[in-house]
Amino acid sequence: MSLKTRYRETIRPKLLKDLGLKNVHQVPKVQKVTLNRGLGEAATNSKALEASLKEMATISGQKALVTRAKKAIATFKIRQGMPIGCAVTLRGDRMYAFLERFINLALPRIRDFRGVSPKSFDGRGNYTIGVKEQLIFPEITFDKVDTIRGMDITIVTSASSDEQGKALLSEMGMPFRKK
């Protein structure tokens, strides 16, 4: 059963009851997942940006967007409009497919993994996790990687509080670390 189907058939009714909500539309849901990678070396090394764009597209199944500098910062040797990273925003079926792969395949492949931190919520039910290496994703092969780079993964939910967001992600199978 896919994560989307499981959400509709089992997770949503359970959360409706557990959180004491009156309406099915009040139940928190995942709105989007954003993958972001900042590349400081992209200003001088265009190959790093190309490789990163390819990796992000492989991981997400969607073309990555080049992020550019908003301002010129002399100490970092960047000018306004220079490419400094890449990002992908996933919604709908691709989002659920990515979340399922991330929770069930990628997270267990992290070295010394004991669960994700329950403190990474932003106060509005959204969760951000930093990944140190892209090799945890089964789509990436070690031979094709030039440099090990990390990325930030943000899961944006419609939850009004961190508790609701944590309840949603826990039901989806996110392995939170025990305190």
Curated annotation (Swiss-Prot):
Annotated InterPro entries: Ribosomal_uL5, Ribosomal_uL5_bac-type, Ribosomal_uL5_C, Ribosomal_uL5_CS, Ribosomal_uL5_dom_sf, Ribosomal_uL5_N
Domain of life: Bacteria
GO MF annotation terms: rRNA binding; structural constituent of ribosome; tRNA binding
Alphabetical GO biological process terms: translation
Regions crossing the membrane: none
GO cellular component terms, semicolon-separated: ribonucleoprotein complex; ribosome
Gene3D superfamilies with a match to the protein in the record: 3.30.1440.10
Key words of the record: Ribonucleoprotein, Ribosomal protein, RNA-binding, rRNA-binding, tRNA-binding
Complexes and interactors: Part of the 50S ribosomal subunit; part of the 5S rRNA/L5/L18/L25 subcomplex. Contacts the 5S rRNA and the P site tRNA. Forms a bridge to the 30S subunit in the 70S ribosome.
Family: Belongs to the universal ribosomal protein uL5 family.
Name assigned to this protein: Large ribosomal subunit protein uL5
Organism per entry: Prochlorococcus marinus (strain NATL2A)
Native organism taxonomy: Bacteria, Bacillati, Cyanobacteriota, Cyanophyceae, Synechococcales
Gene: rplE
